[in-house]
Amino acid sequence: MPNRNILYATTLVDELARAGLRHVCLAPGSRNTPLVLAFARHPAIRVFSHLDERSAAFFALGLALATDTPAAVVCTSGSAAANFFPAIVEAHQAGVPLLALTADRPHELRDSGANQTIDQVKMFGSFARWSVDVALPEAMPPPVALRNLRTLAARAMAIAGGEPRGVVHLNLPFRPPLEPTPMPGDLTEPPAAAQPRDDGAPYTCFLRSAPPAPPEAVIEPIAAVLEQHERGLIVCGPRCPGGAFGALVSELSQRTGYPALVDGVSGVRFGYPGVIGGYETFLFGEHAFPPPEVVLRFGAVLTSKWLNQYLDTAASPVVIHVRASGVWADDSHRVSHFVVADEAAFIRALIPRLTERQSAWRQRFVEAEARVWAAVEAGIADEPYFDGGAVYDVIDLLPEGASLFVGNSLPVRHLDQFGKPGVRHICAFANRGASGIDGNISTALGIGAGRPDAPLAAIVGDITFYHDMNGLLAVRRCGVPATIVLLNNDGGGIFHRLPINRFEPEFTDYFVTPHGLDFAHAAKMYGLEYVPVKDRTAFRSAFRASIDARAATLIELRTDARTDLVRRNALIQAARATGA
């Protein structure tokens, strides 16, 4: 080892890899040189180089979303670390495992006016589950200091990936020399205390058993409630667990006779039989459904305001929320039973205790769902083509196992309204923790890097695209081909749905904020093929060609926000008129 900094960084990074870290995003700088070299030289860790810290952090967030394991992001000192903050907020709010490693100046330079030096100790506050200001490397470290680096790495991975999942911040100060040059008085060979275990295992193994079935004391009261009420719902919000959960939801719906209403980014919308996705259209109107007597909830707070409003029409329903993380997610404050348990284990334990129910209630939802999608399909064929139609067609055209990222603001709501459930399994993602429009492109590309064998599509609005155009550099730099659908209504189209739209000129000038940008230039600069489309035939052709070729393509559909809203409302009214 040339010097103390390289020894410390190499020991820490080696143990992170042994604890399961496989992906890291590196932003260039000087103070983080020991960390950059340690990560770049480790054979078990895939390294992604980014020029910009904000994009790097969101890309790492996407990696963690795609792999369901912690990803790391590394930067130098100063405002570079502050640029991690938006992604860290999203990771905390959404329960995504993320490691933030920030290099820092030594303690004697803090609060001294030294260049590129800010207070980085616990700088992410309550948005980090664990923050550590790591000790400065020493020339002749005692064995316990080196063992601490390995247990620190193991603990960081365990906390980020445990329940509730979230952010771990390691702040690492270094004195020069930062490069791998010899330093007089430093150890020339790693001491025994720095060595890993001979068998390749982590220095500290955090062993988690498979989630046990909830005890009878938990299951029996819930089963009794469900048996008493025929008019119930299963509701799956964003960020439901993967694995067997979706199939178990379908089975539970069949057993209870409760329709399963699933959010577009719940992980249960696409690929699971019998789920309901057209609820926004048929719950209200002339053929409105009566409120449920019991609601069994999974996942985070719903995207759909209409579904939330419908659930709130119940006078005093039983609302049971099951969540392994134990994190509260009920902004209506209607939950009567909060169950902290592994969701799949809970359903497995519950199903045998229920009598299978042939339910006219569930059948009414199934029939309404069929009528809704028939009306939607007929309406989308009409001109002019609009944003919701494009989202419907993306779902129709994506192949089995594809990755889909939907941007916040309108696209995620379009997915909830126009993303038809189907037999093909599509992994749909969105940043619904803090629901910001920043970093969406970078998150999408991180997802593509984390699922390299799956085609990647992203649907974003023009303001979202503008916010993260620099993230497009990862298409070439990190080798992530993506089909990006840009729904360009020249400003903040979502504000047309709010009462402020009646107040001009402030509405246009300060809310819609039309920009008139030509995004073809951005596509050219970042090496994407640019395909402008105006109608459904052109869109479907361009999208299918890009996905089939695994090409890097920007498909731009220019729309008018007012026309889009009129088309959407007319389509919903037409669907309701069918009796759905």
UniProtKB/Swiss-Prot annotation:
Family per similarity comment: Belongs to the TPP enzyme family. MenD subfamily.
One GO biological process term: menaquinone biosynthetic process
Subunit: Homodimer.
UniProt keywords, alphabetically: Magnesium, Manganese, Menaquinone biosynthesis, Metal-binding, Thiamine pyrophosphate, Transferase
Record region (Disordered): 178-199
Gene Ontology molecular function terms on file: 2-succinyl-5-enolpyruvyl-6-hydroxy-3-cyclohexene-1-carboxylic-acid synthase activity; magnesium ion binding; manganese ion binding; thiamine pyrophosphate binding
CDD domains hit by this protein: TPP_PYR_MenD, TPP_SHCHC_synthase
EC number: 2.2.1.9
Annotated HAMAP family: MenD
Physiological role: Catalyzes the thiamine diphosphate-dependent decarboxylation of 2-oxoglutarate and the subsequent addition of the resulting succinic semialdehyde-thiamine pyrophosphate anion to isochorismate to yield 2-succinyl-5-enolpyruvyl-6-hydroxy-3-cyclohexene-1-carboxylate (SEPHCHC).
Pfam families the UniProt entry points to: TPP_enzyme_C, TPP_enzyme_M_2, TPP_enzyme_N
Highest taxon of source: Bacteria
Pathway participation: Quinol/quinone metabolism; 1,4-dihydroxy-2-naphthoate biosynthesis; 1,4-dihydroxy-2-naphthoate from chorismate: step 2/7; Quinol/quinone metabolism; menaquinone biosynthesis
Cofactor dependency: Mg(2+); Mn(2+); thiamine diphosphate
CC cofactor note: Binds 1 thiamine pyrophosphate per subunit.
Name of the protein: 2-succinyl-5-enolpyruvyl-6-hydroxy-3-cyclohexene-1-carboxylate synthase
NCBIfam families in UniProt: menD
Gene from which the chain derives: menD
